[in-house]
Amino acid sequence: MKPNILFIVIDSLRADKCYGDKKTSVTPNIDSLIKNGTYFSQNITAAPATIPSISSTLAGLYPFECVAKEGNFFVVNPNIDNYVKNLKEYNYNCYATLPVLISYLGFDKVFFNNLESYHRTSTLYNGLGEKIIERFKSHAMSEPWFYYLHLYDLMWISTPARFNPDEGPDEIRDDKYGKNQYERIFSVMDTWLGRILHNLNLKNTL
């Protein structure tokens, strides 16, 4: 039986806020994944922006090899082989949940009808997390599946005009969960990641 694959991308996550003695966020679930998995402390991104970086990750190539330009935008090159295409050839059902802002930058030609997008201000704690959990509870994805989950919670804080910490959970305003809003939001994300993992069959999920 082929294992399911959950691939989580946390946009704008800094390595020093995820691991090490400088972080002040509270992340027991991510800490457990690191302890029981593999953590690459010397990993260097191929690009400082989302599309070229993710394109490189999915294709295993440098951005100039796997990114195409459509009008004024750089997109995932649909003519280049990537791991999603390879998984489909091995009879995996490939799904994605990601911000609408980037869903049309080539991802629609990778996941096609199995792509679900959400508004950029949606976060795990304001409804998105429940939708993701319901997806697992309802067995909405046919096995074996590959699920690309792109989270934008940390990006939202970079747009202060749209970020109101008073609308979020108490942890966002509690220094116990981090010395700044960025780290406190990451603490909240960890709680939700734990809930998501709790609803998975971890014995058959990578």
Residue map of PLM features:
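Catalytic domains that recognize anionic headgroups
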Residues: M1-L206
